[in-house]
Amino acid sequence: MSETILITGSSRGIGKAIALRLAQAGFDIVVHCRSRIEEAEAVAQAVRELGQNARVLQFDVSCRSEAADKLTADVEAHGAYYGVVLNAGLTRDNAFPALTDEDWDRVLRTNLDGFYNVLHPIMMPMIRRRKAGRIVCITSVSGLIGNRGQVNYSASKAGIIGAAKALAVELAKRKITVNCVAPGLIDTDILDENVPIDEILKMIPAGRMGDPEEVAHAVNFLMGEKAAYVTRQVIAVNGGLC
């Protein structure tokens, strides 16, 4: 029987690429979305066409009660997850003086609170498996070096890195690894039109944007058996930006 991995925010973009790559590696996939249910179902079907099982969960990671209810019910019905990829997130970019309370709160609730809201309900079931497990958090270069116009986003992603490193210490003896993958500028259809791509490209030694599949390959490595001794780390996929 294949192990199962939950991937939040996997209806498109990087999350979709991760779902398909992990399915190719032989994992069953729980596709997650907040609102794009048709796109999520399409990803699930693509996973099935790769020979793996897939199902879809729909909930808002920023809503603690909703996340707990949906995840608890899914684990009770299907069993604990082997792995989790925390990919769901959003941006509300603006210069710091121009940020609104909602800009700040929405980003922190989704990106940082989402870490707790998703992992807390499923943590004890993962531990009770008494088997190896994997947690990968998709963070950002912004969480490593900060980025102009992204004080809220940078704070949320840096917070995830800190939380992941602390959780890695707690779970290491239980053979559950916790790591982060920090993408830089990645070419997806959800790239914010306000992102100064030409300006950023000048700062990237590789001279190009990354592909979602390149992020997915890093996640695939961390999910594998050969990464059992890799924990509490941040793998940057950013073309040398930092």
Curated annotation (Swiss-Prot):
Biological process per Gene Ontology, one example term: fatty acid biosynthetic process
Domain of life according to the entry: Bacteria
Pfam families assigned to the protein according to its UniProt record, in alphabetical order: adh_short
UniProt pathway annotation: Lipid metabolism; fatty acid biosynthesis
Catalytic activity annotation: a (3R)-hydroxyacyl-[ACP] + NADP(+) = a 3-oxoacyl-[ACP] + NADPH + H(+)
InterPro entries given in the database record: FabG-rel (IPR011285), NAD(P)-bd_dom_sf (IPR036291), SDR (IPR050259), SDR_fam (IPR002347)
UniProt: NADP(+) binding residues: G9, S10, S11, R12, R34, D60, V61, N87, Y153, S154, A155, S156, K157, I186
Annotated binding of substrate, by residue: S140
EC number: 1.1.1.100
Keywords from the UniProt entry: Fatty acid biosynthesis, Fatty acid metabolism, Lipid biosynthesis, Lipid metabolism, NADP, Oxidoreductase
Disulfide bridge positions per record: none
Catalytic residues in the record: Y153
Any one Gene Ontology molecular-function term assigned to this protein's record: 3-oxoacyl-[acyl-carrier-protein] reductase (NADPH) activity
Subunit structure: Homotetramer.
Family classification: Belongs to the short-chain dehydrogenases/reductases (SDR) family.
PANTHER family named among the record's database cross-references: 3-OXOACYL-(ACYL-CARRIER-PROTEIN) REDUCTASE, 3-OXOACYL-[ACYL-CARRIER-PROTEIN] REDUCTASE FABG
Name this protein carries in UniProt: 3-oxoacyl-[acyl-carrier-protein] reductase FabG
Native source species: Aggregatibacter actinomycetemcomitans
